[in-house]
From Swiss-Prot:
Known pathway: Pigment biosynthesis; melanin biosynthesis
CDD domains: THN_reductase-like_SDR_c
Name of this protein: Trihydroxynaphthalene reductase
GO biological process: melanin biosynthetic process
Highest taxon above the source species: Eukaryota
Assigned EC number: 1.1.1.-
Function: Catalyzes the NADPH-dependent reduction of 1,3,8-trihydroxynaphthalene (T3HN) into (-)-vermelone. Essential for appressorial penetration of colletotrichum lagenarium.
Subunit description: Homotetramer.
PANTHER family reported in the protein's UniProt record: OXIDOREDUCTASE, SHORT-CHAIN DEHYDROGENASE/REDUCTASE FAMILY (AFU_ORTHOLOGUE AFUA_5G02870), SHORT-CHAIN DEHYDROGENASE_REDUCTASE FAMILY PROTEIN
Cystine residue pairs: none
Recorded GO MF terms: oxidoreductase activity
Native organism: Colletotrichum orbiculare (strain 104-T / ATCC 96160 / CBS 514.97 / LARS 414 / MAFF 240422)
Gene giving rise to this polypeptide: THR1
Length: 282
């Protein structure tokens, strides 16, 4: 029977948490905050969370117009949404964002840390300024988003960080700074899963690979030998060949996994980094 409450096996340590038989896709009654949600993967995360019933706070750093488009689309899908401007490279802005987010609906159940920047360059050419730019958002920013998430999430909440398959791959030329900034997230996840345990909050990360966003073709050319010589169709064909499924990943592929981790079904997944690349990096 849907909604049946689980029965304890006799100890508080072996009771199945939550009701049984609920629609696994549902996030009704939850409130989510997604950073960098005005475009790309973050946009689709916010949209899919809304489609599954969550109220969504759309964070953006620059374009209020694109963030408002996401807000309106979520409302059109039948849920509710609001937007907050904050640059996650600035810790003061992160703190302010969480304070404002908590005031909107009085609670916070899910935090998706998505904001990030990409960078390419041979080690010999990397400047301190470029190193700091990338790590300020991809690594330091995610750390302090996580810190504030711990303070503001409800007991039993979910924190989902953004890694990259390049943090797991054997090595990508001219990509040390970006890959390093994402590889660090994997260590954060393992340690934070322990620290967050006293509030029953799970901490996981997704590590996408080859996702077709608005920046996809330009970025893909950097991964492809002589990629600058390929037209758009050639880029698509080459990138599709990375996966035995012979297609590229889409933002919805990431969003669905994020929603699973945010749901009741994902409760016993903790301290893990899930590679989402169609087996491109086996």
């Amino acid at each position: 029977m849907p909604g049946v409450t689980s029965q304890s096996a006799g100890s508080k340590y072996d009771a199945i948490p939550g009701p049984l038989g609920l629609a696994s896709a549902s996030l009704m009654g939850k409130v989510a905050l997604v950073t960098g949600a005005g475009r790309g993967i973050g946009r689709e995360m916010a949209m899919e969370l809304g489609r599954r019933g969550a109220k969504v706070i759309v964070n953006y750093a620059n374009s209020a117009e694109t963030a408002e488009e996401v807000v309106q689309a979520i409302k059109k899908s039948g849920s509710d949404a609001a937007s907050i401007k904050a640059n996650v490279s600035d810790v003061d802005q992160i703190v302010k964002m969480f304070g404002e987010a908590k005031q909107i609906w009085g609670r916070l159940d899910i935090v998706c840390s998505n904001s990030g920047v990409v960078s390419f360059g041979h080690v010999k050419d990397v400047t301190p300024e470029e190193f700091d730019r990338v790590f300020a958002i991809n690594t330091r920013g995610q750390f302090f988003v996580a810190r504030e998430a711990y303070k503001h999430l409800e007991v039993g909440g979910r924190l989902i960080l953004m890694g990259s398959i390049t943090g797991q791959a054997k090595g990508v030329p001219k990509h040390a700074v970006y890959s390093g900034s994402k590889g660090t997230i994997e260590t954060f996840v393992r340690c934070m899963a322990i620290d967050f345990g006293d509030k029953k909050i799970t901490v996981n990360a997704v590590a996408p690979g080859g996702i077709k966003t608005d920046m996809y073709r330009d970025v893909c050319r950097e991964y492809i030998p002589n990629g600058g010589e390929l037209d758009d169709e050639g880029v698509d064909e080459f990138a599709a060949g990375w996966s035995p499924m012979h297609r590229v990943g889409l933002p919805i592929d990431i969003a669905r996994v994020v929603c699973f981790l945010a749901s009741q079904d994902g409760e016993w997944i903790n301290g893990k980094v899930l590679g989402i690349d169609g087996a491109a990096c086996m």
